[in-house]
Amino acid sequence: KVNYMKNVAVTLDAILGIDLDQSKYTFKENKAKINELPLEFDGFIQLVDAGQVYDLTFKTPTSSFKNFLGLIPAAYASSLDNVKTSGYSTVSGFAKGTLTDTRVPKFNIAIASNNASFQYPDLPKSVQNIVIDTKIINETGLMNDTYVNLDKLSFSIDQDVFNAKASIKN
């Protein structure tokens, strides 16, 4: 079992439109970071008797591949301080619906990178030509219906090329 969000630094610098009568918080200008991955949000969160209503979109304005690597769980990644990287990655998506004890908002998160690379200082070879095209989707609001489409994962180490596709469902 891997905890994907353990000791993750989250920062948010935002101007919010606050409607106290409706318990509604609307994102105006904002800049957020999950570790070093920058994100921008549009939309709102509203507190209701049943839970919380989400109508949010989000995206990375731009992000180096190194910032994206910072999202890898600590169980799989050592320090990234001295890792050389090149290329960019993007994360975008939406969450729309009500969060309750039994339901989550419907969501779609797209993760992409094209022609990125990284190399740890103590390893002789780099990982190059990294292509990622992944989507994490929930179309029903039931957590067990969440699925992951790994439409493409490709990279090379020296002359060896790795290609993968997968669909992960409950």
What are these regions (language model features)?
Residues 1-50, 59-67, 85-100, 109-169:
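Hydrophobic lipid-interacting interfaces of membrane-associated proteins
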Residues 2, 78-81:
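Extracellular loop and loop/strand-boundary signature of outer-membrane beta-barrel proteins
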Residues 24, 74-79:
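Extracytoplasmic loops and strand-loop junctions of Gram-negative outer membrane beta-barrel proteins
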Residues 68-73:
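Short, flexible, mixed-charge acidic loops at enzyme active sites
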